[in-house]
């Protein structure tokens, strides 16, 4: 199943970094999933720039703290 959405990651100054995500997660874990989990594809973008990408293997590691936070949220939700 594909899921798409937006996560607002607090910056600390009362503002948020907007992280758009696209995630493909299955009902069962897979050898191709992140940490052998259910997510097989995941893209995170901030202002149109890819800040994380996993497509059955890590392509772009988290580029900043907002990407790391969004990744943790999505891992909890879908993996």
Regions found by a protein language model. Name each.
Residues 11, 30, 62-63:
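Generic low-complexity segments that are intrinsically disordered, proline-rich and/or Lys/Arg-biased
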Residues 1-27:
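Negatively charged, low-complexity tracts enriched in Asp/Glu with abundant Ser/Thr
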Residues 20-56:
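A short, structured beta-strand/loop element
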Residues 46-79:
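Mixed-charge, Lys/Arg-enriched low-complexity segments
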């Amino acid at each position: 199943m594909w899921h798409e959405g937006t996560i607002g990651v607090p910056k600390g100054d009362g503002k948020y970094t907007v992280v758009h995500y696209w995630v493909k997660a299955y009902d069962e874990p897979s050898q191709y999933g992140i940490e052998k989990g259910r997510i097989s594809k995941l893209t995170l973008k901030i202002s149109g720039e890819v800040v994380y990408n996993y497509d059955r293997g890590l392509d772009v590691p988290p580029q900043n703290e907002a990407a790391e936070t969004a990744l943790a949220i999505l891992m909890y939700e879908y993996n």
